[in-house]
């Protein structure tokens, strides 16, 4: 708490209770550190169903949670319409649910699939019910490192471009950093 008060003075501390859920484990990003993904067509590949989301969301509400953190792989067949439909359905079933979903690499992937722009994709998702954008997939924003551990994801520059686009449409974002692997202290 002393460190927090040094950086963020004041007596108010907030947090949110959320639930992580994966939209799909199908991914073609080939991250070296991922034990989660499956190739398209793999027998263990899945896309989470609405019934599975209902169970997870209702459990989240039972425990006082209010937000669903949705992440997933770079599925080659799940474009913008899939996520727009998913977000609309989840919000129609649970209007008070906060959707903190996808991340810059997923937005970049969808943008590429659609031949669109980051702003167009983010705006469509926001209109469908996306409340905020998690900062997943940053790993380390060094392209040297990214080429070695997650070369199928967007560049560090594109990750930042997606975040800038989100901020232009007044979307709240967060950011994460994965460190302690092959990066140098300077790259941190």
Where are these regions (language model features)?
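Residue-identity detector for threonine
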Residues: 12-14, 23-24, 48-49, 60, ...
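Short, intrinsically disordered, charge-balanced linker/junction segments flanking boundaries
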Residues: 1, 186-188
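Surface-exposed beta-strand edges and their flanking turn/coil or helix-capping segments
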Residues: 28-32, 114, 148, 188
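Active-site mouth loops of central-metabolism enzymes
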Residues: 18-19, 37-51, 106-117, 149-153, ...
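Glycine-/small-residue-rich active-site loops that bind phosphorylated ligands and cofactors
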Residues: 22-23, 41, 75-78, 180-184
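Conserved SAM/AdoMet-binding glycine-rich loop
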Residues: 65-174, 181
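N-terminal pre-triad scaffold of radical SAM enzymes
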Residues: 2-41, 45-71
